[in-house]
Amino acid sequence: MNNQIIVKELVSEDAEAVRLLLIESYQQYEHYFTPQAWEEYSNRIVSSIDNPNVDIIFVAELEQRVVGTLQLFRSGVEAYEIPELQIQAPIIRLVAVHPEARGRGVGNVLLNNAIQKVKALGESSIYLHTTDFMVHAVQLYKKLGFQRDKTNDFSRGNMVSKCYRLDL
């Protein structure tokens, strides 16, 4: 049995597995949403892999199974299509790890791959947004050195997305 996490860029053969993974990973947060808001959110995350603005979608495999994914965008406008969000640095979105693969370092490996990619591009920082109920994700981001950047928080409905920045 091989316990090595392999990270690659999304290929079309993995698209359906990534869609399922996104739902399986984020479903734990469904109770924080109204039924209509959850339906809109889940539809948005499933269709995200077809977003022409995404720069790279990383896919993590463990034991030849898709167990994680992460999306990397060149800027805040491309990531969120919110003109007021003037982040001109790369943005990480939709970090997802399959529930059965949690605690095995998948999220850490995905994030470090994205960070290394951004460093190789010569960027000086990388951003992401999350919410307070994503407790384990916030802990991982802080462990990797991400710091709160309150100037780039935004809201959709009654949901506040808090910004975190890592200076490289």
Q: What residue spans do the PLM features occupy?
A:
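Acetyl-CoA-dependent GNAT
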Residues: 12-94, 98-99, 111-113, 154, ...
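C-terminal "cap" of GNAT-fold acetyltransferases
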Residues: 21-25, 86-88, 124-127, 131-144, ...
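Basic/polar N-terminal segments that are highly enriched at the extreme N-terminus
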Residues: 1-3
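Conserved phosphate-binding and hydrolysis motifs of nucleotide-dependent enzymes
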Residues: 64, 68, 105-107, 145
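Residue-level signal for alpha-helix termini/capping positions
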Residues: 50, 119-120
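Conserved acetyl-CoA-binding loop-helix of GNAT-fold acetyltransferases
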Residues: 97, 103-116, 143
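Short coil/turn segments at alpha/beta junctions that flank glycine-rich nucleotide-binding fingerprints
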Residues: 104, 121-124
